[in-house]
From Swiss-Prot:
HAMAP family: Adenylate_kinase_Adk. Belongs to the adenylate kinase family. Pathway: Purine metabolism; AMP biosynthesis via salvage pathway; AMP from ADP: step 1/1. It is an enzyme of class 2 (transferase). Pfam families: ADK (PF00406), ADK_lid (PF05191). Consists of three domains, a large central CORE domain and two small peripheral domains, NMPbind and LID, which undergo movements during catalysis. The LID domain closes over the site of phosphoryl transfer upon ATP binding. Assembling and dissambling the active center during each catalytic cycle provides an effective means to prevent ATP hydrolysis. Residues 30-59 are annotated as: NMP. Monomer. Residues 122-159 are annotated as: LID. This is Adenylate kinase. GO terms for molecular function: adenylate kinase activity; ATP binding. ATP binds at G10, A11, G12, K13, G14, T15, R123, I132, Y133, G202. The lineage of its organism: Bacteria, Pseudomonadati, Pseudomonadota, Gammaproteobacteria, Cellvibrionales. Keywords: ATP-binding, Cytoplasm, Kinase, Nucleotide biosynthesis, Nucleotide-binding, Transferase.
Length: 217
């Protein structure tokens, strides 16, 4: 199964990605991981990427697509793969299509913005241990302090409401055109790529069942 998984930060995409990887025995592929691996491996493409990144430039879509094609030719992709965070833009999606990489299913884990803001801005963290609380859904026994150590909890910068809303705005700007692109592909070429939107709210097990059912498991 060759899957593209879309979802705003805080929608629970990472959790569902793990379930999909286990169910289909496929690797999760992100462009960041690919870039780092290529540089580390020292392949001709990796050397080119290293030079570009060292000069502070953005890696072009052409090189990203070459990296993708190189990565999905590896044995662990024999059963398929799960793209996470790629493609991010219409040009990347078009380049992926033109390069002959076939995608079977595009899935978006959809959660309303206000729910995501509530989820993320309510998180509190005990930095030393990594324990995570939520002011509403999983509060500490005593407000503002870790249950075990009694040390203060903090709100990460990434979880500040303004930051969350900014990240959501960027996601919508990038992803809504992608959703339309793949919906159009499905309408114009039935049987090639399927697009599904799954509501990412409710019990985790129910969301997992909806995701795997939509993918044919």
């Amino acid at each position: 199964m060759r899957i593209i998984l879309l979802g705003a930060p805080g929608a629970g995409k990472g959790t569902q990605a793990k379930f999909i990887m286990e169910a289909f025995e496929i690797p999760q592929i992100s462009t960041g991981d690919m870039l780092r691996a290529a540089v580390k491996a020292g392949s001709p493409l990796g050397v080119k990427v290293k030079d570009i990144m060292a000069s502070g430039q953005l890696v072009s879509d052409d090189i990203i697509i070459d990296l993708v094609k190189e990565r999905i030719s590896k044995p662990d992709c024999a059963n398929g793969f799960l793209f996470d965070g790629f493609p991010r833009t219409i040009p990347q999606a078009e380049a992926l299509t033109e390069s002959g990489v076939e995608i079977e299913h595009v899935m978006e884990i959809h959660v309303d913005d206000e729910e995501i803001v509530a989820r993320l801005s309510g998180r509190r963290v005990h930095e030393a241990s990594g324990r995570i609380y939520h002011v509403t859904h999983n509060p500490p026994k005593t407000e503002g302090v870790d249950d075990i150590t009694g040390e203060p909890l903090v709100q990460r910068d990434d979880d500040q409401e303004d930051t969350v809303r900014n990240r959501l705005s960027i996601y919508h700007d990038q992803t809504e055109p992608l959703v339309e692109y793949y919906q159009k592909q499905e309408a114009e070429n039935p049987g090639t790529v399927k697009f599904t939107r799954i509501a990412g709210v409710g019990p985790l097990a129910e969301i997992k069942d909806k995701v795997l059912s939509a993918l044919g498991k």
